[in-house]
């Protein structure tokens, strides 16, 4: 096998037969050889890494997105490398600065709201940049996601069509969670168009958990016992709320309806299926990775809008 062929196999480039490829890779494994990607990157000005910047690893949403990205990059020679911002703009700036210094082949990052410094770095990077999870705004390069305003409005339609009118909202008091804020804005706007106002709202600090959902649900229903529907900003607190209501004898969905957001697998294990919205997380990850890998062309307007889908579940009255 020639040096050129070995080089092509190790760089995952060019047309090499499967048998020859396997022979080269077996020899490399036997020798414990790991190619120096930085040296290779100096020649091409790019390494085979895709920077993936997300706000949280504890949030159940992002592992699904990462799964979609990883599955789509699997046959490309590109590897996702993850940075976490904890919903902090300054942390996002630092993560992007470090990751872009490696000259990755592309960047996938959550959200459309970034600091001026982050936007400047991404504008000047000269590589594919895909902002994910949201399409309500103007992308730097390409956006792949759902409209959270639309998701909120469509859930409002569903709740009103089922006959509920005394509606409360429970969500995070996190100013940097722009997508949750847009969902609530779309939700309230649609309620207002139908002559209904939110009857109560309860905000919490920090991350979402079943316990937080239980506590917030108890608090809002103690304060406003006449509520007939609770809209939660995500499934985790919605699931906690559902468990609290069931333990306390609420007639669901007759006396009280509940809905969350995301469509996470956790809901499969609950005694009742929580009404929610599928946020298309795996599809978003896949489509973003396809654009970075060059499998799919960037759309002319830079936006790939997927449709949020309501999953009716069992916690809303049939209508």
Where are each of the predicted segments found?
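Flexible loop/turn connectors
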Residues: 218, 223-319
């Amino acid at each position: 096998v020639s040096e050129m062929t070995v080089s092509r196999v190790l760089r995952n480039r060019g047309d090499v037969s499967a048998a020859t490829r396997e022979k080269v890779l077996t020899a490399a494994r036997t020798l414990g050889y790991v190619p120096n990607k930085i040296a290779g990157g100096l020649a091409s000005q790019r390494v085979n890494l895709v920077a993936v910047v997300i706000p949280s690893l504890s949030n159940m949403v992002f592992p699904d997105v990462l799964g979609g990205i990883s599955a789509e990059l699997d046959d490309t020679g590109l590897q996702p490398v993850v940075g976490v911002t904890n919903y902090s703009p300054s942390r996002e700036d630092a993560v992007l600065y470090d990751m872009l210094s490696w000259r990755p082949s592309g960047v996938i990052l959550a959200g459309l709201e970034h600091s001026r410094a982050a936007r400047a770095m991404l504008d000047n990077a000269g590589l594919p940049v895909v902002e994910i999870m949201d399409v309500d705004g103007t992308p730097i390069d390409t956006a792949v996601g759902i409209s959270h305003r639309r998701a909120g409005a469509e859930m409002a339609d569903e709740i009103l069509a089922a006959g509920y009118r005394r509606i409360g909202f429970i969500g995070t008091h996190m100013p940097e969670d722009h997508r949750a804020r847009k969902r609530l804005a779309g939700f309230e706007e649609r309620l207002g168009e139908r002559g209904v106002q939110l009857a109560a709202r309860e905000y919490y600090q920090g991350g979402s958990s079943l316990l937080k959902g239980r506590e917030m649900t108890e608090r809002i229903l103690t304060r406003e016992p006449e509520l007939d529907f609770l809209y939660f900003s995500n499934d985790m607190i919605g699931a906690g709320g559902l468990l609290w209501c069931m333990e306390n004898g609420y007639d669901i969905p007759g006396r009280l309806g509940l809905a969350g957001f995301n469509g996470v697998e956790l809901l499969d294990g609950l005694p009742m299926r929580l009404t929610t919205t599928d946020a298309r997380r795996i599809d978003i990850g896949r489509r973003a990775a396809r654009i970075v890998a060059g499998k799919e062309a960037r759309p002319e307007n830079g936006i790939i809008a997927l449709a949020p889908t309501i999953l009716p579940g069992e916690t809303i009255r049939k209508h």
